[in-house]
Amino acid sequence: WKKEAYYDLMNKLKVAPGQRISRMSNGQRSQVALGLILAQNPELLILDDFSLGLDPGYRRLFVDYLRDYARSENKTVFLTSHIIQDMERLIDDCIIMDYGSILIQQPIETLMKGLRKYTCTVPEGYQPQLPVTCYHPAVIRQTLETYSFLPPSDVEGLLKENQVPFTGLQHENVGLEDAFIGLTGKY
């Protein structure tokens, strides 16, 4: 038992030691429960949608606290979340799943440096047929959008090879949320 972890988090949340749980918001109650879990000093911490019900301020505070705790205490944290932007600041390794299948498993740094979003202009009504190395190609108002780990010159070559009538190919690195959408599809 490591009570300091609990009291440190409660202090950051400004929760008084004698404050009744019945008078706390749902977010504060969740944080108290998470503080109690941290106080147990587990080697492996499993959190499923840990930020559910937390307002943005509490969520950010807890993400920062959890990141610092895991690093300073050398703990392993396995977590899931539907708030993807929290994960980008928190994780070292990433697994993106879609309908029970693992699409990608790699260090977050590798994913963020490698995946790019590509856009270009195509004629009205054009429907792309691209190889699987270009994820979820879609056209919205004459803009073809796809994601790929390939470098820009290779994507340009694929577009030409597949006789895509395009102009103005552009690319940008993406954040984790865009990476998730790019790999799983928009909807």
Predicted regions and their residues:
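Short, surface-exposed beta-strand/loop "edge" segments at domain boundaries and coil↔beta transitions
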Residues: 45-50, 125-128, 153-156
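ABC transporter nucleotide-binding domains
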Residues: 1-85, 89-92, 98, 103
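Solvent-exposed, flexible loop/coil residues
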Residues: 25, 56, 112-115, 178-180
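ABC transporter nucleotide-binding domain
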Residues: 61-150, 170
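Generic alpha-helical secondary structure signal
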Residues: 4-8, 60, 109, 150-153, ...
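Conserved protein kinase catalytic domain
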Residues: 10, 63, 112, 180-181
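C-terminal coupling/interaction segments
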Residues: 143, 147-187
